Amino acid sequence: MNLEEMKERQKHIRNFSIVAHIDHGKSTLADRILEMTDSISKREMKNQILDDMPLERERGITIKLNAVALTYHAKDGEDYIFHLIDTPGHVDFSYEVSRSLAACEGAVLVVDATQGVEAQTLANVFLALDNDLEILPVINKIDLPSADPEGTKKQIEDEIGLDPDEAVDISAKTGMGVDEVLEKIVKDVPAPTGDLTAPLKALIFDSKYDDYRGVVLSVRVVEGTVKKGDRIKLMNGGTEYEVAEVGINSPKPLARDVLMAGDVGYITAAIKDIKDTRVGDTVTSADNPTDKPLEGYRQMTPMVYAGLYPTDNAKFNDLRDALEKLQLNDAALTFEPESSQALGFGFRCGFLGLLHMDVIQERLEREFNLDLITTAPSVTYHVELADGTTKEVENPAEMPDASSIKAIKEPYVRASIMVPNDYVGPVMELCQRKRGDFDTMEYLSDTRVNVIYHIPLSEIIFDFFDKLKSSTRGYASLDYEIDGYRPSNLVKIDILLNGDKVDALSFIAHRDFAAERGREITAKLKKIIPRQNFEIPIQAAIGSKIIARTNIKAYRKDVTARIHTGDPDRRAKLLDKQKRGKKRMKAVGKVDIPQAAFMAVLKTDEQLDEK
């Protein structure tokens, strides 16, 4: 392909993402677009075709961004190359959305006609505006009886500031109106403008590990071209490789002769060292490198930390290898080794939220055949010590002795809760109960309010989202961002089983709620931990002060069953022998703690009962 042909091809490229609040129909719209561009045969077509992880299909959510190249024959008679990137909708995966948008010129914003504009809809609009993208509003599910397309258009105008007349009414399920969306993409999304003759400059927006090909880089080529046999350089580490293959996903990988400025595709170069590749890095030519790298991505800060431990300590190295491979595919995951007296060796992992943590644990167990125990999640605390130094504490077990602590600061979030007027009362009540500070209330329309509170992150990760949904019958939507650290009256609560501290069950709580939480946790653990042949006391303590206690009763074997009822001496002797045996067993007996016990520190009673 000569330069003129490349320039002509570039004019026909359209790079766009589909973004929306969770459950508004992104993946269904992606399915229809694939169908209408004949990218996939009727035989291969299935729902959520781009959600290729079994976990995504089971949960019905998108977890990973997914890029696919399509050819669309437009009404003007020309063929256009669409690079479509499907993105997640859950707040935990907003990092995936921001990476997708950096590889695009346009964003199709899907809004559910039955739900209207929700918190994550707004968050995605701001991400798209940050990346200077053309936003195409689409109103989905207009075929449902409860759909209100006119009301939704008004929200799009009032709350987002987009022209409601530009919004396209569609039903992604039936395909109605989708052809109009495709035509708008051709007309309104600008073609990429990268210089084809400049040195290669490509942004790595995702990557994964393949056992046969090594690391597969997903790239958006910004300038120049790359083909098989070229020498490339990863600018972050300076490592050089020879390109083994370039291609596009359509949706299966298809090798191509060349990737040029504007293309979204993949590069393989027999990269075996996972540490060499980083999402956000710039790929350039080793022989003719570019002067300065692309801006890349801001480093994500984990919001939630938890310990991951293999049930078999011999699998520690397998867990490390698995985490390294997952980190390649999920740049927001962080981990470092740690050890626990109760659980042995494992890793302290950082996640963006509880769903992110759940998904990582499930992927590790499924994809890498590991059996894991996860400790209760916690946040990062800033501890000011009496000697003037500050320590960051991610693990409650590492909290310094209370006598050496001057102050403890905890992270707060600015929570934006969109809710119908009728439910403002229950929402404010919930926020107050969760130690929230009221900020402001914005009336978005006659029927909807945006309530803004500053709430400790530790309260958000506990059970806030479930309580919010139940107190508003599912109508509220939540978006939040970190809002700095504030001093709080916090204490570390230790859990003792049979008199021994279990470091992995320690947690941090506000002093005002410490006794209540201690009683809750000990009661939950009593339900979960199996009975033994000896009585097990469960205690919650702040330092040396016990604030709550309960006992798990011992199994009682009837040792007197075989003796004659009229022999009281023999009976007393056997009972005394049993008592002495249990006392000895209690002194040396180790209590087996099931996985559910570690999550009991987090879950509410209702959630435990459901299990």
From Swiss-Prot:
CDD domains: EF4_II (cd03699), EF4_III (cd16260), LepA (cd01890), lepA_C (cd03709). It comes from the Bacteria. It is a peripheral membrane protein. GO terms for cellular component: plasma membrane. InterPro entries: EF-4, EFG_III/V, EFG_V-like, EFTu-like_2, LepA_C_sf, LepA_CTD, LepA_IV, P-loop_NTPase. GO terms for molecular function: GTP binding; GTPase activity; ribosome binding; translation elongation factor activity. PROSITE patterns: G_TR_2. Its main location: membrane. It is found in: Cell membrane. One of its GO terms (biological process) is positive regulation of translation. SUPFAM superfamilies: EF-G C-terminal domain-like, P-loop containing nucleoside triphosphate hydrolases. It catalyses: GTP + H2O = GDP + phosphate + H(+). Keywords: Cell membrane, GTP-binding, Hydrolase, Membrane, Nucleotide-binding, Protein biosynthesis. The keyword rRNA-binding does not apply. GTP binds at residues 23-28, 140-143. Its EC number is 3.6.5.n1. Residues 11-193 form the tr-type G domain. Belongs to the TRAFAC class translation factor GTPase superfamily. Classic translation factor GTPase family. LepA subfamily. Required for accurate and efficient protein synthesis under certain stress conditions. May act as a fidelity factor of the translation reaction, by catalyzing a one-codon backward translocation of tRNAs on improperly translocated ribosomes. Back-translocation proceeds from a post-translocation (POST) complex to a pre-translocation (PRE) complex, thus giving elongation factor G a second chance to translocate the tRNAs correctly. Binds to ribosomes in a GTP-dependent manner. PANTHER family: TRANSLATION FACTOR GUF1 HOMOLOG, CHLOROPLASTIC (PTHR43512:SF4), TRANSLATION FACTOR GUF1-RELATED (PTHR43512). This is Elongation factor 4.
